[in-house]
C-alpha cells in the first residue's frame, strides 16, 4: 500500500527541503542554550512556520492552523538533516500550552514569546531525595519574604536547571 499526502503537502515538503538545504551550514554545537545564535535560529524557525506553528502570532508563534501532516513533514525533513532542531524542554512543551489555555493575559504576554524564542529556559523540579515522584510527600517550601520568594529544600533530576 502506498500512502500519499497529496499535492498541497508535496509543495510544502518541497519548501521545507529547500529551507533545510539553504541552512545546512548552520551549526550550534557547543553554543549555550542562552546564546544569541540559538535565539536567532529559534526565531527563524518560527518565522518560517517550522516551530510554534499553531501558536498565535500575538504570543510569538507562527499563527498557522494546526496541521498534523505539515508537522510530520517538518519533523521528517529536519530528522534527515544536520541542521539544528528547535529548542524543546519543559517551558515549550509543558508551560506554554498550559499558559495559553489557563494563563492570564499578563502571564501570556510576559512568558510565552520569550519561552518560544529561547530567551527564557525553564526547568521542573518536583523529585526529592525521599519522595521520588510522590508529590504528596514533597518537603520543599517557598515563603514570601518582602518582594521575593525564598525557597528551601532539595531537588533531584532537575532537567535544564543549569540554564533556567
Region locations from a protein language model:
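Amphipathic, small/basic residue-rich leader segments at the start of a protein or domain
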Residues: 1-89, 106-117, 121
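Short, solvent-exposed polar/charged micro-motifs at secondary-structure junctions
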Residues: 39-43, 64-65, 96-99, 133-136
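Short hydrophobic "helix-edge" motifs at membrane interfaces and signal-peptide entry regions
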Residues: 46-47, 94-95, 143-144
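Glycine-rich, Trp-frequent "lid" loop and neighboring beta-strands that shape
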Residues: 62-64, 106-164
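N-terminal glycine-rich flavin-associated loop
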Residues: 86-106, 132
Amino acid at each position: 500500500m502506498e500512502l500519499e499526502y497529496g499535492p498541497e503537502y508535496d509543495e510544502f515538503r518541497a519548501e521545507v527541503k529547500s529551507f533545510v538545504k539553504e541552512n545546512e551550514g548552520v551549526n550550534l554545537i557547543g553554543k549555550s542554550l542562552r546564546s544569541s545564535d540559538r535565539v536567532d535560529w529559534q526565531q527563524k524557525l518560527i518565522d518560517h512556520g517550522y516551530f510554534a506553528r499553531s501558536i498565535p502570532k500575538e504570543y510569538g508563534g507562527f499563527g498557522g492552523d494546526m496541521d498534523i501532516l505539515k508537522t510530520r513533514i517538518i519533523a521528517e525533513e529536519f530528522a534527515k538533516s544536520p541542521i539544528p532542531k528547535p529548542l524543546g524542554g519543559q517551558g515549550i512543551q509543558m508551560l506554554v500550552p498550559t499558559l495559553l489555555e489557563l494563563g492570564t493575559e499578563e502571564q501570556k504576554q510576559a512568558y510565552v514569546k520569550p519561552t518560544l524564542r529561547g530567551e527564557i529556559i525553564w526547568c521542573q523540579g518536583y523529585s526529592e531525595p525521599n519522595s521520588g515522584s510522590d508529590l504528596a510527600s514533597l518537603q520543599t517550601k517557598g515563603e514570601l519574604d518582602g518582594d521575593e520568594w525564598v525557597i528551601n529544600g532539595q531537588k533531584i533530576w532537575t532537567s535544564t536547571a543549569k540554564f533556567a
